[in-house]
Amino acid sequence: MFVKTGDKVKVIAGSEKGKEGTVLSVNVKENRVVVKGVNMIKKATKASASNANGGVVETEGSIHASNVKVIAKAESNKD
């Protein structure tokens, strides 16, 4: 896959078009990436030992890899 964890990317298609962020994770099997600060979704969580109150948590959702363009490679990925 052309994008790796840690790369800085720009979203080139979809509702988040124009946003930039760092790749947090890559799912090679489904050809999807999770970009920091892009495609934020709200998820309801139950109360637990680590989260006493529970409630709504905002987290990044995945987007298809074809919707992003690499701006800068991560330092460890420069080949």
UniProtKB/Swiss-Prot annotation:
The keyword Protein biosynthesis does not apply. InterPro entries: KOW, Rib_uL2_dom2, Ribosomal_uL24, Ribosomal_uL24_CS, Ribosomal_uL24_KOW, Translation_prot_SH3-like_sf. The lineage of its organism: Bacteria, Bacillati, Bacillota, Bacilli, Lactobacillales. It comes from Lactobacillus delbrueckii subsp. bulgaricus (strain ATCC 11842 / DSM 20081 / BCRC 10696 / JCM 1002 / NBRC 13953 / NCIMB 11778 / NCTC 12712 / WDCM 00102 / Lb 14). GO terms for molecular function: rRNA binding; structural constituent of ribosome. GO terms for biological process: translation. One of two assembly initiator proteins, it binds directly to the 5'-end of the 23S rRNA, where it nucleates assembly of the 50S subunit. This is Large ribosomal subunit protein uL24. The keyword Repeat does not apply. GO terms for cellular component: ribonucleoprotein complex; ribosome. Belongs to the universal ribosomal protein uL24 family. Pfam families: KOW, ribosomal_L24. SUPFAM superfamilies: Translation proteins SH3-like domain (SSF50104). Part of the 50S ribosomal subunit. It comes from the Bacteria. Keywords: Ribonucleoprotein, Ribosomal protein, RNA-binding, rRNA-binding.
